[in-house]
Amino acid sequence: MFGKGGMGNMMKQAQQMQERMQKLQEEIANMEVTGESGAGLVKVTITGSHSVRRVDIDESLMEDDKEMLEDLIAAAFNDAARRVEETQKEKMAGVTGGMQLPPGMKMPF
């Protein structure tokens, strides 16, 4: 069914892929991504595990209303989270050889 040494090779490849995935998961968790809103007036920097590292608010917004500022912060965080997801997909595609995951399955495992 697998040919000579086929099963052994397949197991070895699976182990190598698992090791690469583990290393990549650590790399992603430690990366930082910045999202912006209000044409860069609000910036939120988060890690690959979605922990907020920094929130930068332009001085000009301190005089505006509180609700608008809250909306801009939320939008900047959402932009950063979207960028993390995109980066994860790109990096994981390199490890999985572009193989698509089944629907509903998220990385890292």
UniProtKB/Swiss-Prot annotation:
List keywords of the entry alphabetically.
Cytoplasm, DNA-binding
Q: Pfam families, per this entry?
A: YbaB_DNA_bd
Where does the record place it? Cytoplasm, Nucleoid
* Gene Ontology cellular component terms for the protein in this record: bacterial nucleoid; cytosol
> Which Gene3D superfamilies does the record match to this protein?
Nucleoid-associated protein YbaB-like domain (3.30.1310.10)
Q: Where is the composition biased (Low complexity)?
A: 9-18
Major localization class: cytoplasm
The entry lists its GO molecular-function terms as: DNA binding
Q: Where is this region: Disordered?
A: 1-22, 88-109
Reply yes or no: does the keyword ATP-binding apply: no
Q: Does the keyword DNA-binding apply?
A: yes
**Can you tell me which family this protein belongs to?**
Belongs to the YbaB/EbfC family.
Q: Its function?
A: Binds to DNA and alters its conformation. May be involved in regulation of gene expression, nucleoid organization and DNA protection.
Write down the NCBIfam families for this protein, in alphabetical order: DNA_YbaB_EbfC
**Subunit structure comment from the entry:** Homodimer.
Q: What is the name of this protein?
A: Nucleoid-associated protein VS_0917
List the source organism. Vibrio atlanticus (strain LGP32)
